[in-house]
Amino acid sequence: MRCSVSSVVRPLSVDPATAIATLCSKGNLREAFQRFRLNIFTNTSLFTPFIQSCTTRQSLPSGKQLHCLLVVSGFSSDKFICNHLMSMYSKLGDFPSAVAVYGRMRKKNYMSSNILINGYVRAGDLVNARKVFDEMPDRKLTTWNAMIAGLIQFEFNEEGLSLFREMHGLGFSPDEYTLGSVFSGSAGLRSVSIGQQIHGYTIKYGLELDLVVNSSLAHMYMRNGKLQDGEIVIRSMPVRNLVAWNTLIMGNAQNGCPETVLYLYKMMKISGCRPNKITFVTVLSSCSDLAIRGQGQQIHAEAIKIGASSVVAVVSSLISMYSKCGCLGDAAKAFSEREDEDEVMWSSMISAYGFHGQGDEAIELFNTMAEQTNMEINEVAFLNLLYACSHSGLKDKGLELFDMMVEKYGFKPGLKHYTCVVDLLGRAGCLDQAEAIIRSMPIKTDIVIWKTLLSACNIHKNAEMAQRVFKEILQIDPNDSACYVLLANVHASAKRWRDVSEVRKSMRDKNVKKEAGISWFEHKGEVHQFKMGDRSQSKSKEIYSYLKELTLEMKLKGYKPDTASVLHDMDEEEKESDLVQHSEKLAVAFALMILPEGAPIRIIKNLRVCSDCHVAFKYISVIKNREITLRDGSRFHHFINGKCSCGDYW
């Protein structure tokens, strides 16, 4: 049987642009380009898939070659093609070329301006972004969103909210992206009232169930200290996605609830939501705050498993976490295994060395950063260096670095830099010079810098200056309990009990409560916490009995309790009994009781360790042949064989 020509089924003709786009999306670029060559002069839309492919593959050279081909083909002035080119150049980091394309366009539309505004915002050039915005004859909602988001991203919150009000006044209805930005703006301004006003728009425009809007709304409440209100918003969401979980976790971190952060992280994983780099940065920070190394290591392993451990922000958080848990070696290992270079990462490692009193290592790392890398040295690096010098007794080197920061690098010292210099001089006993710097510096003082000097007065027993500094502090904050305690310590050291009584009476009259000293350590995933005179532990009787025997052993080795640090006028026996009850001693005693023989001990204390406990830990490290790491309110102390890493310079 013969078939007629008309009965043969012909293949359907496929539009070249569609065929090329399909091939590009599948990665078949060679076949796509062959199709492209056959139809190169027929349709401008044929170029679009290739431009998008260059953007996706991060191939700027190929994109530029394609741009040249467009010029030769006579399509380089087509506004749609130009928009794609601008987008490509902007996303691939060649923004000047995007601006050049925009400048040569004969006809522009709102998309052209939107791309340019977004590019300027990405480059941090808000002046030119606003110029393009103001010159636009016709603005769409996306244009307003881009400009508002840009202003708020760079913390021009008032300007961003003002632009939102202008937009709304012109009759534009906000969408989820608009409201997400303005909630961030009100969070940045720490204005609950503005945020609550904007909250009304979510209901008015039917966006009360939108995930983006609710996450931003919750962030606004939490950033303003309204943690419960933020949690209510998150719980009302029909679905809790990654952004919502991160908002909840970050909100608790910002409000000083690290234990809740770790609980929420656990619940997030149980829900099946996979963490990202933002999650890891936040939960590692909470591990740092609590100094719980075991959980930090577990989270590190989870970050490795999903490929987030090499992300710069995560590496910096790992360095900080291990450092604050007393594991400087692990922090250095995380730093050495980095895959990318970043100023924040280097500054984190310099800070870690400083926190552990290893000033020489911090300076060496800074010199390597300055001489062997292309990274910019910033004020933060110098701040960490000055801190390292102040905690290592490197007075002259610290002052030299301060001068270098100003004269060689041209940085204007901030209040924190001056505070480090005051600490540097104060610890070295140069109290008059430290006070002179505070009184002559060109910026306004705060309570921290005066407390730093008061602490130095305590170290060097300068009661006259301490009284003078205390008066300055009272003008700033008359309710800071630490300052009263420091002044009382100075008087107690000089056995000026009447002055001590006056300080204590002043605290009672003003209802100033002394912050309780708390010490803790982690063992097998459990945190054991102690406070001064704590008898709430199930083994309190055994702990005090163990401490009594340990104190006798220490005395046989030459230990003499530093009763001068007791702020009460009582007999020596009572003072010694008082010293035994310090939280860090209770913690180290229980750690010695339950940890395996020879295992290192890591203890955290929320306040500065007292001089007696510092001496006692030296003796304990010898008697029990243990390495003891103590993190107090200002630094780390590593006790090995009767010596402390701080060199008694603390």
Swiss-Prot record:
Region (Type DYW motif): 556-650
Keywords: Repeat
A Pfam cross-reference name: PPR
InterPro entries found in the cross-reference section: DYW_dom, E_motif, Pentatricopeptide_rpt, PPR_At4g14850-like_plant, TPR-like_helical_dom_sf
GO molecular function (one): zinc ion binding
PPR repeats by residue range: 43-77, 78-112, 114-139, 140-174, 175-209, 210-240, 241-275, 276-310, 311-341, 342-372, 378-413, 414-444
Type E motif, as annotated region: 449-524
SUPFAM superfamilies per record: TPR-like (SSF48452)
Keyword Repeat: yes
Region annotation Type E(+) motif: where it falls in the sequence: 525-555
GO biological process terms on file: RNA modification
Family to which this protein belongs: Belongs to the PPR family. PCMP-H subfamily.
NCBIfam families with a match to the protein in the record: PPR
Name of this protein: Pentatricopeptide repeat-containing protein At2g41080
Species of origin: Arabidopsis thaliana
